[in-house]
Amino acid sequence: MNAHGTDVLFPVVMLDVRDGATIGELRTMFDVLRTAGLRGKPHVTMTDSSTVRSMPDATVRRFVAEQQAEVETLYGHLVIGSAVVVGSSVVRGALTAINWIKPTRVPQVFTTTRMDALVQCISWLEQEAVAVPPEVRAYRMQLERNPNARPVAAR
């Protein structure tokens, strides 16, 4: 699977995107964002795109833009921050510069590792006095042992 998501660690909503993601896979991933939004509670998103090496075609890009706009319109007010793992230092730098020029509504950072992204997400939650579940802290410890670890279903 080249695109998927989980809210098993809510209020941390985790998304993974890889090269070759299909519209069907991306639709399922965006459904995870909708499900998180339907909870009606503040949350953060953590997206791992570290293995992406190529730009998707125009149809996929348009689909992602439309889905993102819809989710943001409906549930964006609940998102505290967004951390994105980006493999390329050049792309990471370019995205950071774009955010300096045109800041996003919510804080957004681009990191090199899942650990850095999760640490930032925890920090945002704590700053907003949103409870950080023990499963999120356990996942952080898991990442210390294995930087590529994926969360185990907590619920």
Locations of the language-model features?
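Amphipathic, Lys/Arg-enriched alpha-helical "gate/interface" segment within cytosolic domains
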Residues: 1-155
